[in-house]
Curated annotation (Swiss-Prot):
Protein name as catalogued: Probable G-protein coupled receptor Mth-like 14
Organism field: Drosophila melanogaster (Fruit fly)
Entries under CDD domains matching the protein: 7tmB3_Methuselah-like (cd15039)
Entries under InterPro entries matching the protein: GPCR_Mth-like, Methusela_ecto_dom_2, Methuselah_N_sf
GO cellular-component term (any): membrane
Region (Disordered): 86-108
Alphabetical list of PANTHER family matching this protein: G-PROTEIN COUPLED RECEPTOR MTH-LIKE 1-RELATED, G-PROTEIN COUPLED RECEPTOR MTH-LIKE 14-RELATED
Source superkingdom: Eukaryota
Subcellular location: Cell membrane
Length: 533
């Protein structure tokens, strides 16, 4: 074989080697390009205006009950409100492209009728974060709208899949925590899941996420979103057995109040302006106690309409008491000194004014409560352990305290009115001729009514002070149940005060005797013969 053949053979071998190397390089390039097409994340998927989550591939570990944390997150095909650092596919080459290869998480967020989004401040108010460490906050009137992102998602072992279903949730108002941690949207992204729990995704660093069930979410006046998550869960406030016991006392008070209301509406001698006001006052308290006790005994949800009905009834009770105190003052300072004899039409007009005031006042307060999104349940059976519970009573405790204070002032003014008018009774014995005849019997009746009203006022003030002590006390001491017992027995106090006094007892016994069920003794007949008809 000559030299030319060898040269030809070497050329063929070199050409074959070149083609093989070119084929291998082409295969590697195609493989690399395909890998980049399936794993690369475009910058435009993380922009400042997007709000939906498509899916997330995340490594998950359980932290504490009802709290789940994930680390080493690889977010694929997701869009968030701000830029989130994306992990290179070279770092995690085995991560799947979606959640289909992941095991579904054992506990899933499920939307229920009771699912709520927890807002820190009432409607129309925003957070005011103050102090350097941002450890304290309060709610101020604000104009910024609160529109958090709500998603429906499925939790997998290392992945979150957005179902892209439009979801809406009602709001619960207030911070439910004894102590809390503060998150803000500078470092985290917040989403609310379909069951009302909060999904927190870390923008920077370890690319982790957390799900919290006990939290509240709101914005400050600059538009930044903040989340307060509970460090410790709220303890049970009052044992169920104690709640049932006090609720039973309320049910015992109810027939006493209904009896007072019925007798003052039925008996002609008791059916005057004072008696009708007392009747409606007792009826309002009986209605509130009945609904309140049934709700707690049977565990009926007290959010929404039922809570507002109870709030309206209890507030009406205090407003009617204020009307009764004002009626005593009106008699002492105007009707008795001026010898005013009220006609039936004037008494009807006077009662209508009382009714408008006693019902429109509570209705206005309930309307404000609804507007702010606060629960309407009164503070009975509650302890203000958290900010949300304390804030829920802003339209119950301050109004009732104000009404009782005004009633106390009216009773004091009425007392000085009695001191002033007592001179008329003494002067009547010495003066033979008077321009107008002073009604001594009416004076005695008003005086007895004033004594009963003042005694009831003392009981109401004492029971209300005990209620405030119970609400703001942070302990579960046994003496707190005694405070609630005094409140639960208010119907019994009303019965004893307004029906056991001698003149009313005599009138009731006479009414009973007319039906053949009682024999009136001589002293009672003598008292009746001296009383006006």
């Amino acid at each position: 074989m000559n030299l030319g053949h060898w040269n030809f053979l070497l050329a063929l071998i070199s050409l074959q080697t070149f083609f093989n190397a070119s084929a291998q390089i082409s295969t590697v390039n195609n493989s690399s390009k395909g890998s980049n097409n399936s794993n690369i994340f475009h910058e435009d998927t993380f922009n400042s205006t997007s709000i939906d989550v498509l899916d997330a591939s995340i490594h998950s570990t359980l932290v504490v009950p009802q709290t789940y944390s994930t680390e080493a997150a690889t977010i694929s095909g997701a869009r968030f409100a701000t830029s989130v650092p994306v992990q290179s596919p070279v770092d995690n080459p085995l991560d799947p492209a979606d959640c289909s290869q992941r095991e579904k998480y054992r506990k899933q967020p499920v939307a229920t009728p009771s699912s709520r989004l927890r807002k820190c401040c009432p409607h129309g108010e925003n957070l005011n974060i103050y102090r350097e460490n941002q450890s304290d906050s309060m709610c101020d009137n604000g104009l910024l709208s609160f529109e958090p992102t709500i998603i429906s998602a499925v939790l997998f072992d290392n992945c979150i899949e957005d179902l892209e279903v439009e979801t809406t949730l009602d709001y619960d108002i207030g911070n439910p925590c004894n102590s809390s941690l503060l998150y803000d949207d500078k470092d985290d992204v917040f989403f609310v899941l379909q069951d009302g729990s909060l999904l927190i995704i870390d923008k920077f660093g370890n690319e982790s996420y957390t799900v919290k069930e006990h939290y509240c979410l709101d914005i400050d006046k600059s538009g930044h979103l903040f989340a307060f998550t509970c460090v410790t869960q709220v303890e049970e406030q009052i044992a169920f057995a104690k709640v049932v016991f006090v609720a039973v006392l309320m049910l015992i008070s109810m027939p006493c109040l209904l009896l007072v209301s019925y007798l003052h509406m039925t008996l002609r001698l008791l059916r005057n302006l004072h008696g009708l006001s007392l009747s409606l006052m007792s009826l309002c308290l009986a209605s509130g106690y009945f609904v309140h006790s049934v709700v707690h005994i049977y565990g009926i949800p007290n959010q929404g309409f039922i809570g507002y009905v109870i709030q309206f009834c209890i507030l009406s009770y205090f407003f009617w008491y204020l009307c009764i105190c004002f009626n005593v003052l009106l008699n002492v300072w105007y009707k008795l000194p001026c010898c005013i004899q009220c006609s039936k039409s004037w008494a009807t007009f006077n009662f209508a004014c009382y009714a408008v005031f006693a019902f429109s006042g509570p209705a206005t307060i309930v309307a404000l409560t609804v507007q702010k999104g606060l629960p309407g349940m009164p503070s009975y059976f509650l302890q203000g352990l958290t900010e949300s519970i304390r804030d829920s009573q802003r339209y119950f405790i301050p109004p009732v305290s104000t009404i009782l204070f005004l009633s106390f002032l009216l009773n004091i003014i009425s007392f000085f009115g009695f001191q002033r008018i007592s001179g008329y009774a003494k002067a009547e014995k010495n003066i033979q001729e008077r321009k107008c005849l002073f009604d001594q019997q009416k004076y005695e009746d008003v005086k007895k009514d004033a004594k009963c009203v003042s005694l009831l006022g003392i009981i109401m003030v004492v029971s209300w002070l005990l209620e405030i002590i119970t609400f703001y006390s942070g302990s579960n001491s046994n003496y707190l149940i005694l405070c609630d017992m005094v409140n639960g027995l208010q119907g019994v106090w009303v019965l004893l005060i307004f029906l056991v006094v001698r003149r009313r007892r005599t009138i009731i016994l006479r009414w009973w005797y007319d039906r053949g069920s009682h024999e009136i003794e001589g002293t009672e007949l003598q008292a009746l013969s001296n009383s006006p008809t």
